[in-house]
């Protein structure tokens, strides 16, 4: 008799997908992206300068970040290193418009990423309870052909979203003090602003970088 796995595979290959099937599938992905989107924030990099007439001016750069951890006193946000590189001060803006000061917690010049912290005392109890932490996934489980979701700023705007597939996986890429795992995807992306890659369970499995574009 034919193995059950072969029967299932054959049936799936012969199944004719309809527009309704496609809408249902993307509806599920949209739900995942919407839920994770609650943990996406805007990170404002503020520089204090003076104009030609010695008048103080403020310039602001905007980046995307994701809330990756929360303790009793602070929340930690992963964001591109560029967001903190020349910042005199940092502001974190939540999806509901709440603005709180941030401070540099850690930076990784190899990965070009940084962690910004905010004090939970700057939020109300209700706001603290509503903080949505993005769950960390296992990037080593990513396989070629996997569907992925991009959140953060893939379209160059914070809180934009895109969907795509993993095109290729490089399991061992030499990096400073270790080996990195890199995968390529066809999702729209903006590495400078901050684009974060999720699996279909809504878990963070990576972020977009342009370091390996020519390799």
Positions of predicted regions on the chain:
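N-terminal activation segment of mature serine protease catalytic domains
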Residues: 2-70, 76-77, 89, 143
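Active-site substrate-binding loop(s) of clan PA
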Residues: 31, 67, 103-105, 123-157, ...
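Active-site-proximal beta-strands of protease catalytic cores
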Residues: 40-42, 75-80, 141-154, 194-214
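Short, conserved beta-turn/loop elements at beta-strand boundaries and strand-helix junctions
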Residues: 48-49, 60, 70-72, 85-86, ...
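Short, small/polar residue-rich loop motifs at catalytic or cofactor-binding pockets
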Residues: 60-62, 86, 189-193
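Catalytic-histidine neighborhood of serine endopeptidases
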Residues: 70-112, 120-121
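Beta-strand/loop subdomains of soluble extracytoplasmic proteins
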Residues: 86-104, 143-148, 159-172, 181
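Active-site region of chymotrypsin-like
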Residues: 120-134, 162-214
């Amino acid at each position: 008799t034919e193995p059950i796995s072969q029967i299932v595979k054959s049936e799936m290959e012969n199944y004719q997908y309809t527009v309704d099937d496609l809408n249902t599938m993307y509806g599920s992905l949209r739900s995942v992206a919407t839920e994770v989107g609650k943990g996406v924030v805007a990170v404002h990099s503020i520089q204090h300068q003076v104009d030609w007439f010695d008048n103080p001016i403020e310039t602001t750069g905007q980046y995307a970040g994701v809330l990756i951890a929360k303790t009793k006193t602070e929340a930690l946000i992963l964001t591109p290193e560029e967001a903190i590189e020349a910042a005199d001060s940092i502001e974190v803006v939540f999806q509901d418009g709440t603005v709180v000061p941030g401070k540099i917690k850690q930076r990784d010049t190899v990965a070009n990423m940084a962690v910004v912290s905010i004090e939970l005392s700057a939020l109300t109890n209700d706001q603290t309870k509503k903080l949505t932490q993005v769950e960390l996934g296992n990037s080593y489980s990513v396989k070629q052909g996997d569907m992925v979701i991009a959140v953060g700023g893939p379209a160059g705007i914070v809180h934009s979203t895109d969907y795509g597939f993993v095109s290729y996986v490089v399991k061992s890429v030499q990096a400073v003090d270790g080996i990195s795992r890199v995968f390529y995807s066809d999702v729209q992306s903006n590495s400078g602003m901050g684009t974060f890659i999720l699996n279909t369970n809504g878990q963070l499995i990576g972020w977009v970088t342009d370091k390996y574009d020519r390799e």
